[in-house]
């Protein structure tokens, strides 16, 4: 069973999220959902903080459906959420895949991330996000600041961990996945994909197939 955690401004009905789900159905059952504040889901996005509760609920539901083995596959924001979920909920998942995730919070080193920070932190940006991207963002700052992805990674072991990142990612350069891999040490695996951009849009069917095979091989 795969539980797919989409990226920021994604949603269960977005074509790129549906494509990911279809590709993974070749390897097992798939649960998809929309994070809070995204698409038709209620509430407001906290951009990776309380979304860990949403993923936990989806994983619990997958278990209640009778699936004994569950792997989480997260993209960008969803990738950071998958890392924190695995660190905070002991034995919640049997394998974790994080694709295009940041290693640290508040990164503004690329133009796309500076635009994203404008969407999140400015009232006019949140209006654009609501009506342009169907994503409603909470106006409050994080308090407390959640565990960062790189801090979460060492707490995931012994659950198998796969970190996937494109070397042409326009949001987070390759020092992010390398930081995550270093934090995982020999408990994680890094795939640095040549020519790949960011998150679901950039994940080829071939890559999704390899991810599906990896999860099946590790989670059983």
Q: What is each stretch, according to the model?
A:
Residues 8-21:
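The serine-hydrolase catalytic nucleophile loop
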Residues 21-42:
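Conserved alpha/beta-hydrolase
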Residues 46-65:
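Alpha/beta-hydrolase active-site loop
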Residues 74-78, 82:
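Gly/Ala-rich beta-loop-alpha elbow adjacent to hydrolase catalytic centers
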Residues 90-141:
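Hydrolase active-site cap/lid region
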Residues 156-157, 163-165:
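Short beta-strand/loop motif that positions the catalytic acidic residue
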Residues 170-176:
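Conserved alpha/beta-hydrolase "acid-adjacent" motif
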Residues 196-206:
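Catalytic histidine-centered segment of alpha/beta-hydrolase-like enzymes
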């Amino acid at each position: 069973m795969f539980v797919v955690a989409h990226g920021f401004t994604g949603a269960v009905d977005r074509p790129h999220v549906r494509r990911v789900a279809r590709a993974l159905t070749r390897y097992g059952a798939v649960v998809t959902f929309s994070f809070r504040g995204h698409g038709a889901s209620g509430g407001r996005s906290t951009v990776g903080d309380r979304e860990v509760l949403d993923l936990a609920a989806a994983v619990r539901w997958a278990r209640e459906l009778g699936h004994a083995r569950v792997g989480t596959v997260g993209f960008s924001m969803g990738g950071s959420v998958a890392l924190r979920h695995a660190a905070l909920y002991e034995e919640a998942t049997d394998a974790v895949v994080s694709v295009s995730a940041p290693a640290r919070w508040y990164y503004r080193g690329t133009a796309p991330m500076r635009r994203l920070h404008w969407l999140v932190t400015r009232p006019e940006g949140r209006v654009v996000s609501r009506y342009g991207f169907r994503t409603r963002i909470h106006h409050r700052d994080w308090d407390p600041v959640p565990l960062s992805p790189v801090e979460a990674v060492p707490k995931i072991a012994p659950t198998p961990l796969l970190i996937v990142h494109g070397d042409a990612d326009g949001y987070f350069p390759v020092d992010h996945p390398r930081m995550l891999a270093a934090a995982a040490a020999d408990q994680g695996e890094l795939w640095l994909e040549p020519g790949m951009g960011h998150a679901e849009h950039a994940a080829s069917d071939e890559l999704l197939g390899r991810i599906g095979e990896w999860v099946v091989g590790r989670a059983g």
